[in-house]
């Protein structure tokens, strides 16, 4: 595959991944706003515990999404620095082959570590979102039961 096709596929992949992450962040923000709107006139009670757990789950989902984006940014920067080192144009590494080899290896290790963290945070962003949604549904069912039995 020519370099242009590889670059274009990589660009498309990054775009899709970023859009997905931002979509999940927006869903979480909307879910929290919806929960706040539903409970604006409510008083605290034990029946709200599942809602509190849902909000915590959504907060953790938001945190994981933000951390994922931070690691993506850091990885892109590390890739940029790796290319500069390998081309011999990095101001600190220069063209010294030993320094270039050592710097390249260190940067590759950092990229691999970042990639693992990106995967970790991406998985947990989704998991916490779903957990929050499940606890929200549990809370909603409890509220419906309480309204039914209070009639």
Predicted regions span which residues?
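Alpha-helical transmembrane segments of integral membrane proteins
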Residues: 44-151
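Cytosolic-side membrane-entry/anchor segment at the start of a transmembrane helix
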Residues: 1-41
């Amino acid at each position: 595959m020519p370099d242009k096709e590889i670059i274009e596929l990589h660009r498309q992949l990054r775009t899709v991944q970023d859009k997905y992450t931002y979509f999940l962040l927006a869903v979480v923000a909307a879910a929290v706003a919806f929960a706040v709107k539903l409970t604006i006139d409510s008083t605290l009670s034990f029946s709200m515990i599942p809602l509190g757990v849902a909000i915590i789950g959504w907060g953790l989902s938001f945190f994981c999404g933000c951390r994922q984006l931070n690691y993506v940014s850091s990885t892109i920067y590390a890739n940029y620095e790796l290319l500069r080192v390998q081309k011999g144009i990095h101001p600190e590494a220069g063209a010294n082959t030993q320094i270039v080899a050592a710097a390249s290896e260190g940067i590759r290790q950092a990229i691999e570590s970042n990639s693992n963290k990106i995967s970790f945070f991406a998985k947990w962003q989704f998991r916490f979102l779903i957990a929050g949604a499940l606890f929200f549904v549990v809370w909603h069912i409890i509220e419906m039961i309480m309204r039914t039995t209070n009639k």
